């Protein structure tokens, strides 16, 4: 009897596919899979859509919620290609920042003062709209300040910031209501424990949010408003005509809607052939919990190309695009070992010197940049509106951009 049982088990194992075989047999390559849309699917899910919002990031969800506020009877659907928003909304660092001094000084070399202050004003207004829409508790919003770090070789840049600080505090203060937003806080360096940092400037009204909680709350708000959300809805192209907007999917079928609002940010060049939107990838890591971590707040290093913050007793650290700009101008996710090595070196030599900090996980996010930092909110054809190019400031400006995009889509003046 025992030999019979053993023989049966051997036969069963021989028939069972290996894990490798299972991976190949049950995981279809969706981007190559084509099929027809059934009558039931077309009539029940896609026939009555009034506005299709493409992209379920901060901009797309804020737009969808605002559309329902403008007209509660409007049938709004959000179409998202990923299981979760694919891009930057769930992959950023959660900084509620609106402008460090060096960034604004650099911007003043490229644009007028009115233009630079206009961008800051939109970022600040966007943050207030996000907080009002989601709520500070749901955001896990903490106004811990945003810090800019200066090394010894950046002494001249620091002095330039110091000279302009009274002027910046006056002009930015008119926007934020803070009389002394920017402040030198070198006395905090010892507590943070950084190595090789000579000066710190804090922007006091800046803070941080929990990106995951933020997006969960936005999804809940959208669904409560009656917005339908379709994940796995991969689009190949958007085609406008007198009959409406034809949305061609990667699965071989299409649907037609009266209006479309495109909120895909870094993927606008790919989907909408918009060369004025440059996709840019950022590498991000989060450490394992760091015993005795003293870092608290959001920090910018090397003109803001590197950034880090505390999160759940860990360090979240990202950036470094300036080390390999051409490679990182891409809308493809993936690692860059040169940049990842630099991030680890920054972590172990500057942020937590003398410690070997285990990395929990890595990921990448895709931003949408351009020659100017003003977002693109415009009607590109009679029935198609775009709200893209957040310039790495999606948390700050995304809600405002989405709401203004919704209003333009419906014919309001913005």
Q: Where do the protein language model's features map onto the residues?
A:
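Central helical "cap/lid" subdomain
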Residues: 249-295
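A conserved short coil-to-beta-strand element within the FAD-binding core of flavoproteins
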Residues: 231-244
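Active-site lid/adjacent beta-loop-alpha segment flanking the redox-cofactor pocket in flavoenzymes
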Residues: 293-374, 378-380
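Extreme N-terminal leader/targeting segments of oxidoreductases
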Residues: 5-13, 20-51, 69
């Amino acid at each position: 009897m025992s030999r019979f049982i053993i023989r049966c088990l051997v036969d069963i194992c021989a028939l069972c596919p290996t894990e490798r075989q299972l991976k190949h047999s049950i995981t279809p390559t969706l981007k190559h899979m084509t099929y027809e849309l059934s009558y039931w699917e077309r009539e029940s899910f896609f026939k009555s859509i009034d506005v299709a919002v493409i992209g379920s990031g901060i901009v797309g969800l804020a737009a969808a919620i605002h559309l329902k506020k403008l007209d509660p009877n409007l049938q709004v659907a959000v179409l998202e290609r990923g299981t979760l928003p694919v891009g930057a909304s769930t992959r950023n660092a959660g900084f509620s920042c609106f402008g460090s001094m060096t960034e604004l000084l650099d911007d003043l070399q490229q644009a007028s003062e009115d233009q630079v202050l206009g961008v800051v004003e939109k970022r600040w207004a966007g943050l207030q709209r996000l907080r009002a829409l989601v709520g500070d508790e749901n955001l896990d919003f903490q106004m811990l300040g945003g810090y800019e770090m200066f090394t010894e070789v950046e002494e001249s840049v620091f002095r330039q910031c110091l000279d302009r600080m009274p002027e910046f505090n006056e002009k930015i203060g008119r926007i934020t209501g803070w009389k002394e937003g920017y402040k030198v806080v070198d006395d905090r360096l010892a507590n943070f424990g950084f190595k090789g940092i000579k000066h710190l400037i804090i922007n006091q009204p800046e803070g941080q949010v929990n990106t995951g909680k933020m997006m969960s709350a936005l999804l809940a708000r959208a669904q409560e408003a009656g917005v339908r959300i379709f994940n796995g809805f991969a689009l190949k192209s958007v085609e406008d005509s007198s009959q409406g907007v034809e949305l061609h999917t990667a699965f071989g079928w299409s649907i037609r809607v009266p209006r479309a609002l495109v909120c895909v940010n870094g993927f606008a060049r790919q989907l909408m052939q918009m060369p004025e939107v440059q996709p840019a990838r950022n590498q991000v890591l989060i450490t394992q919990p760091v015993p005795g971590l003293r870092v608290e707040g959001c920090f910018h290093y090397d003109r803001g190309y590197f950034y880090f913050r505390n999160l759940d007793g860990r360090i979240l650290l990202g950036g470094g695009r300036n080390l390999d700009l051409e490679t990182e101008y891409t809308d493809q996710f993936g690692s860059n070992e040169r940049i990842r090595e630099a991030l680890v070196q920054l972590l172990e030599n500057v942020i937590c010197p003398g410690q070997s900090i285990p990395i929990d996980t890595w990921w990448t996010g895709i931003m949408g940049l351009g020659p100017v930092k003003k977002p693109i909110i415009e009607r590109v054809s009679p029935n198609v509106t775009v709200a893209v190019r957040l310039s790495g400031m999606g948390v700050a400006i995304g809600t405002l951009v989405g709401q203004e995009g919704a209003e333009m889509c419906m014919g309001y003046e913005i």
